[in-house]
Regions:
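Short, Lys/Arg-rich flexible segments
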Residues: 1-89, 112-115, 119-173
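Extended Gly/Ser/Thr-rich low-complexity repeat segments
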Residues: 90-106
């Protein structure tokens, strides 16, 4: 962008107005790009979460079943945050249990170590199967759940698409 002006009050004022208009276009582009990337990230993370399997409950016959779960992804703070909501979000993202996720410090999720994910309770991960009591007072046996990583996988995918998304947003202005 080139702006030519003379050293006169009116010419300088016109140049300043041109710059202010350009600044508004840049701010709109930044906001539109941020929102578009955030919405695509949320949409793809939701698709991955919807196809995830959660839990591995073992029934009395030894059959393994997946549990129902809630994993809702939304955009917040004017596109500055993509948030996953639900009671099972951490388990779906990072996994639970030594059976699927290995010994302490060997989580399949690349960011787990930074968040102290992958440590185990009193038994230190010695048991591949454990039980908990459900809302009906019944013991449920489980191996835990493998790290599905919908947020992390979506981030990797969308990050590679940012140049193309930026071009699409710029062309739409």
């Amino acid at each position: 962008m080139n702006i030519r002006f003379e050293l006169s009050k009116d010419s300088i004022k016109a140049a300043v107005n041109t710059l202010k208009a350009y600044q508004k276009r840049v701010e709109k582009y930044e906001r539109d790009l941020r929102l578009e990337v955030a919405h695509r990230l949320a949409e793809y993370a939701q698709q991955l979460a919807d196809s995830a399997e959660y839990g591995s409950v073992i029934d009395d016959e030894g059959n393994v079943h997946s549990l129902p779960f809630t994993f809702d992804v939304s955009v917040a703070n004017d596109g500055r945050l993509v948030v996953a909501h639900g009671d099972e979000v951490a388990f779906i993202e990072f996994g639970a249990g030594v059976y699927y996720n290995g010994a302490v410090g060997t989580s399949p999720h690349p960011k787990a170590g930074n968040l102290t994910i992958g440590s185990y309770g009193k038994g230190k991960g010695a048991q591949e199967t454990w039980a908990y009591m459900d809302e009906n007072g019944e013991f449920v046996y489980t191996h835990g759940t493998i790290a599905q990583m919908p947020m992390y996988k979506a981030l990797l995918s969308i990050a590679q698409q940012v140049p193309r998304i930026a071009k699409e947003v710029a062309e739409s202005l």
